[in-house]
Regions:
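Active-site neighborhoods and metal-handling regions in enzymes and metal-associated proteins
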Residues: 1-172
Length: 172
């Protein structure tokens, strides 16, 4: 379905460089897919600590990402615009990062103005089907906007009505 991404440089989206050596304290990202004989694709990503346990900072970031995921899942229901779920996940992230001293100010303002996108440069998910990013532009052009213009703001521009749900963020 796509070349496996296996890297200690998860801060670079779709990083296929494999020349690094994993060392103590690193986080290891694997983003892998599979394709069935029928042609349908799957996509799975996970980040694990090289030392098998998170450092305290890594644990704090993991807990923020997990809260983003859980709050997003709770918010999903028929009729809710996917952008609202994205905004919710971004606000959860901003509040968590404020607790770590990495962001400040009002979370709603930060999300509205795009300050969160420094840590959340991607959308919330993507369509999957016969391609791992099936009909990539469908959600942006045809689904869920009701005539509203598509945002060009980093992170927001790739919102789609889609599964899987993949909240997360990047910290370099």
């Amino acid at each position: 379905s796509f070349p496996t991404i296996a890297t200690i440089n998860g801060q670079t989206l779709h990083n296929h460089y494999h020349g690094n050596k994993i060392k103590s304290g690193d986080l290891f990202l694997i983003d892998a897919g599979a394709e069935l004989p029928s042609g349908y694709c799957g996509d799975m990503s996970s980040t694990v600590p090289a030392d098998k346990t998170f450092t305290s900072k890594q644990r704090a970031v993991y807990e923020i990402q997990n809260a983003m995921h859980l709050e997003s899942v709770k918010a999903l229901r028929p009729g809710i615009p996917y952008m609202e779920v994205y905004d919710l996940s971004a606000r959860v992230m901003v509040e968590g990062l404020k607790g770590l001293g990495l962001m400040k100010g009002n979370a709603d303002d930060a999300v509205r103005e795009g300050a969160h996108a420094l840590f959340y440069p991607h959308g919330l998910g993507h369509m999957m089907g016969l391609d791992v990013h099936d009909m990539e532009n469908l959600g942006e052009v045809w689904v869920g906007y009701n005539g509203q213009p598509k945002s060009t703001q980093f992170g927001r521009k790739s919102q789609r009505l889609a599964i899987p749900l993949e909240p997360g963020f990047v910290h370099t």
